[in-house]
Structures are given as structure tokens and as C-alpha cells.
């Protein structure tokens, strides 16, 4: 419903060879309030992937946005936990499904939209 909530469906491992394409995909966030990364298709993340996600989170946060995750595999989330990313982003931004994340993003409200 809110045009400022975006969902991206990722597939394949997020490791050093894929981080360039990952970063390029989110080069223009425009007026994105909440970016939901559906991670069901991402079996693993390495330290380069964690760093790319952290940079994306920082960019969104600077503009008042939120990075959210849906359907993340346990192994990928464990890597994010080891890298400190779950603590930085917040456990409240991890969801079982994209639908749940979208509902929550819209419930939280959008600073760009009239309330």
C-alpha cells in the first residue's frame, strides 16, 4: 500500500563475488522508508556480504529508513549474529515472511506519508 515500502527478493549466496551487484542493486534508494530483503533464496552470507548489508543499513538509517529481513535461513542469520549485524539492525526487524514484514513496516508508519 505504501509506495515507500520496497521488497527485494534475493537469490544465491551473498559473498564477496556478489556484493558488487548487491550494492549496485540498491544504489538508488530514493524515498524508501522500509526496505525488506526477502532472504529465503540466500543460503549463506560471508563477511563481505555482512559488510555490504551493514553499509546498506547505514545508508537507509541516515535517511530515516529501516532495513528489514524476511525468511532468512538459520545459517545466514547465525553469520549475521556473529558479525554483530543482528544486534545493530535489531531483532525486531527480522520476520518469517515478507507479508509479515510489509504489515509491520506499514504499521510503524512512514515519515514520508501523511498520517
Residue spans of the language-model regions?
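Structured cytosolic domains appended to multi-pass membrane proteins
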Residues: 1-115
Amino acid at each position: 500500500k505504501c509506495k515507500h515500502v520496497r521488497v527485494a527478493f534475493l537469490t544465491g549466496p551473498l559473498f564477496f563475488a556478489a556484493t558488487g551487484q548487491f550494492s549496485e542493486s540498491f544504489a538508488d534508494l530514493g524515498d524508501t522508508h522500509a526496505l525488506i530483503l526477502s532472504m529465503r533464496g540466500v543460503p549463506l552470507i560471508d563477511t563481505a556480504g555482512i559488510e555490504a548489508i551493514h553499509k546498506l543499513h547505514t545508508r537507509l538509517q541516515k535517511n530515516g529508513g529501516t532495513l528489514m529481513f524476511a525468511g532468512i535461513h538459520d545459517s545466514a542469520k547465525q553469520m549475521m549474529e556473529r558479525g554483530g549485524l543482528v544486534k545493530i539492525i535489531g531483532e525486531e526487524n527480522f520476520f518469517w515472511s515478507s507479508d509479515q514484514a510489509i504489515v509491520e513496516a506499514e504499521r510503524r508508519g512512514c515519515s514520508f506519508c501523511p498520517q
